[in-house]
């Protein structure tokens, strides 16, 4: 989640993480913090300072998760469903139902589909609507997730069928990029099995993708230097 600082005239608090907690009658946001200076007083006025670069990296991995989900559905069929996911400032992790490993040529194909969408740089659209209307527009809902009467629909990419308002359409309350092009680059760094009939893909975007390629180049240069010696 978000990181940053909570400041007042006499107090400085570092926010290490933020979590959204769904209770029976309300939603709360839990902040994990470290007090660097001063004390936390209930009647004090604080200024909140969000680390926007960290949020951008998380948003990039979240938006790219939606693109990956749709690319998998396109390759293996619409029966592919999300079984779990994690988005951080460093990478994304996506679990989905599939009963066999994915060959390297298909992983490359899926990666290329996501990057093609990123290069098209379409706008990420968000809209609040009733759940029935969302389903009629082709939105994907997560199995087991509880939704209210009004839902937030996140869509991106040009639709290839009249049944959907966009290429990717999902019910989602998370933070996203404004345009998919802000993800810059998508790179799959791992594919594995985590349970019977469940596969996992790990990938990086933006800064993490650039660092990945820099590391690969460093290894290549080191190898070339070793060969020459």
Go through each PLM region and give its residues.
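A glycine- and charged-residue-rich anion-binding loop/surface
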Residues: 1-223, 229
